[in-house]
Amino acid sequence: MTDIVLNDLPFVDGPPAEGQSRISWIKNGEEILGADTQYGSEGSMNRPTVSVLRNVEVLDKNIGILKTSLETANSDIKTIQGILDVSGDIEALAQIGINKKDISDLKTLTSEHTEILNGTNNTVDSILADIGPFNAEANSVYRTIRNDLLWIKRELGQYTGQDINGLPVVGNPSSGMKHRIINNTDVITSQGIRLSELETKFIESDVGSLTIEVGNLREELGPKPPSFSQNVYSRLNEIDTKQTTVESDISAIKTSIGYPGNNSIITSVNTNTDNIASINLELNQSGGIKQRLTVIETSIGSDDIPSSIKGQIKDNTTSIESLNGIVGENTSSGLRANVSWLNQIVGTDSSGGQPSPPGSLLNRVSTIETSVSGLNNAVQNLQVEIGNNSAGIKGQVVALNTLVNGTNPNGSTVEERGLTNSIKANETNIASVTQEVNTAKGNISSLQGDVQALQEAGYIPEAPRDGQAYVRKDGEWVFLSTFLSPA
């Protein structure tokens, strides 16, 4: 709402302010002159009356301004009533009291949910503390706990007829470390059987005949060399192995040189020489394969350099060995037992492919999240609608309450006095101003009639010379103050 700005009276009887003038009353001894024309307002007789008329015109404009302001205020009040939506016998204060109670209930409910959320947050923080932080230096690959456990399960593998979780699966082969352990166990068992058979045969054999056979074998093999390093079987096995390798190499050489073929070896060698030169250039030039390989070798490094790949692999191997000890041998020891227990308590998440069982932490957290999400949305919507002292319903109520009741009943502006006080004062002032205007209009009409009569009579007796201001009324002189403010 804009401020009501009223125009100041142009003429006053007391000391004038800026932009005002004193009323020039008729003085004793002054020649009384009327208008020169029938509808003119000049002349000393008309001078104070014209000043009063100008004041009346300003008052009329001010009344129009007040009327416009009142119409605007009435429109604003109707708008306020529409915003408050107060109908029937329910008053605005009662409605505000209901809203206050609802807000108090919401605060209590929000406090309860805050306590629940704090408890949930403490539980989650405790779980996070038990899990521990991720160390990127010690573990270069980031996985979630479930993915890490899944990776460990896959590395550990499964027995025949089971899956990695130990559940029976018909026809499922063994895999991972369990598969290798089973194979090693089978090999060790077969070696034990062979050793047992050899021991049995040695015990049952004839040592004398063995001596003769050994002598015959020595004659066939020849004398023992002075520097004995390997036995005959080892050397024969080595020769057989080398023979197989030589035959494979010869076959590979034939295939490589294209034997038998049409191209001569020298042609192929020259071509290869050119290709090798090109390859050497590619290898040795700046940014070539050799330089890049050096960078790769530096990156790979060695076990004693922690930042190198080998160093990280060593750290990972050590960590995995430690993890294997921490994880446990089966589902009844180590982390596997803890994880099995946690799976029952916490429940499986979405990556497990199974819904969280009722009563598990994940199921309860999911239920709480759904409830809290709905409550948060409802509370946020209510907070937005209710607002604060400067916005929303609360802000509008505060602003309207201030606008209606004001801040200072004796203030100089409508906002300070309030709409209620201003309207009451304006009603009183308008009634008084209306009465004064009507009286002034009547007096002016009477003055105009008197002036007209004087003009027609052509004679006006002189007023008393006692220093008072007089006007003519009903054929005689009366005080101007009495004329303007009749009893």
Curated annotation (Swiss-Prot):
Keywords attached to this entry: Chaperone, Coiled coil, Isopeptide bond, Late protein, Virion
One GO cellular component term: virion component
Disulfide links within the chain: none
Database matches in Gene3D superfamilies: 6-Phosphogluconate Dehydrogenase, domain 3
Location of this chain's protein in the cell: Virion
Cross-link annotation Glycyl lysine isopeptide (Lys-Gly) (interchain with G-Cter in host protein DncV), location: K100
PTM annotation, UniProt: Cross-linked via an isopeptide bond to E.coli host protein DncV during infection.
Function: Chaperone involved in tail fiber assembly and retraction. Acts as a chaperone helping to attach the long tail fibers to the virus during the assembly process. During phage assembly, twelve fibritin molecules attach to the phage neck via gp13: six molecules forming the collar and six molecules forming the whiskers.
Domain free text: The central domain consists of 12 alpha-helical domains (19-40 residues long) with coiled-coil structural patterns.
The protein's name: Fibritin
